[in-house]
Amino acid sequence: MTLQKLVATAVLVALVSLILNNAAAFTPNWVYQTLEDGRKRSVGLWKSCWLVDRGKGVTSPGTRTGQVDTHDCEVLGWGSESAGFQESRGTVKLQFDMMRACNLVATAALVVGQITFILGLTGLPLMSPESQCWEEAMAAAFQLASFVLVIGLVTFYRIGPYTNLSWSCYLNIGACLLATLAAAMLIWNILHRREDCMAPRVIVISRSLTARFRRGLDNDYVESPC
């Protein structure tokens, strides 16, 4: 049995989702925050950087003259208070912690789906392309990734007046949509296969049965694949 193009396309879509999800996680452009003194900074899941306002000539603390093109960045982690600077610290800290956890779970689920696809190509008994469990395992992994990303993104439904969502957040939304699309393609393929198996068996009788007075007639028939 040859590998179905729909399954390969779904896995490719999930791979793009995995790339976008990691790109959104490791870029410091999840939100933009404006401080009272006019300084601006971009905050990501794992990094925060001060931005240089070229119009006003405002630079980040500790930046020397002539270094207007550099960013002063700091690493963020679980429960970082600096992510909520200028906003409600407790709320923003919870938002970023939730998104970090959901991002890691989604990454793991997408990687498991890719590994399942590769194992199926090796011809393992339980994960072969002929086994329906192979597609179901990939669909479950991609659907889990989509589900947890939705949970994480919903936490950013309400943000403070000094904060604006940036392109990394929208990049993660695209990753969520692609993971959903990959899971939907596999689920549709599974259901379509089941409908084919529920159809009645087709028996084609050989023309040799119409011959008269012939001994040893063979009842040749062809059944449906299911």
From Swiss-Prot:
The primary site where this protein sits is: other
Query: What are the transmembrane regions?
Result: 6-26, 104-124, 137-157, 171-191
Q: What are the glycosylated positions?
A: 164
GO cellular component terms listed in the entry, alphabetical order:
adherens junction; plasma membrane
Query: Where's it found, cell-wise?
Result: Cell junction, Adherens junction; Cell membrane
- Any idea what this protein is called? Transmembrane protein 204
Kindly give the membrane topology term recorded for this protein: Multi-pass membrane protein
Q: Which residues lie on this side of the membrane: Extracellular?
A: 27-103, 158-170
Alphabetic keyword roster: Cell junction, Cell membrane, Glycoprotein, Membrane, Transmembrane, Transmembrane helix
GO terms under biological process = lymph vessel development; regulation of vascular endothelial growth factor receptor signaling pathway; smooth muscle cell differentiation
